């Protein structure tokens, strides 16, 4: 993977995340995942979650309170690697997003 501008699919994912943070509605965000998707967090006591419904329930139970901005991106095939900063300035992290067609099949989020 090489650094490059954020892919359109990853930009849509981040926009959907930020919209859900603002609205508190995680159903639309969860619809971006395959029915059997997995989501893991590294560095926080949450998950892992398997399945679209479990992902939506996980976000609803422990919703993020801050939006994020991608600071660096790299893509290779069906994988986008994103580095991000919380907009409040409280930290940074990474997202590895694996795609199956236009839906997310696997999401791993790590916190620095």
Q: Predicted regions span which residues?
A:
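A structural signal for well-ordered alpha-helical scaffolds and beta->alpha junctions
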Residues: 10, 14, 52-55, 90
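A beta-strand edge to alpha-helix "cap/lid" segment located at domain peripheries
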Residues: 2, 56-112
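A solvent-exposed, acidic/Ser-Thr-rich amphipathic alpha-helical stretch
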Residues: 28-76
């Amino acid at each position: 993977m090489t650094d490059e501008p954020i892919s359109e699919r990853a930009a849509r994912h981040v926009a959907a995340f930020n919209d859900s943070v603002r609205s508190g509605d995680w159903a639309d965000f969860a619809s971006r995942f395959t029915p059997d998707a997995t989501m893991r967090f590294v560095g926080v006591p949450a998950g892992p979650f398997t399945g679209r419904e479990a992902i939506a329930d996980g976000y609803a139970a422990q919703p993020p309170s801050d939006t994020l901005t991608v600071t660096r991106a790299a893509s290779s095939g069906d994988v986008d690697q994103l580095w991000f900063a919380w907009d409040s300035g409280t930290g940074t992290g990474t997202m590895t997003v694996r795609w199956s067609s236009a839906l997310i099949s696997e999401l791993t989020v790590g916190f620095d």
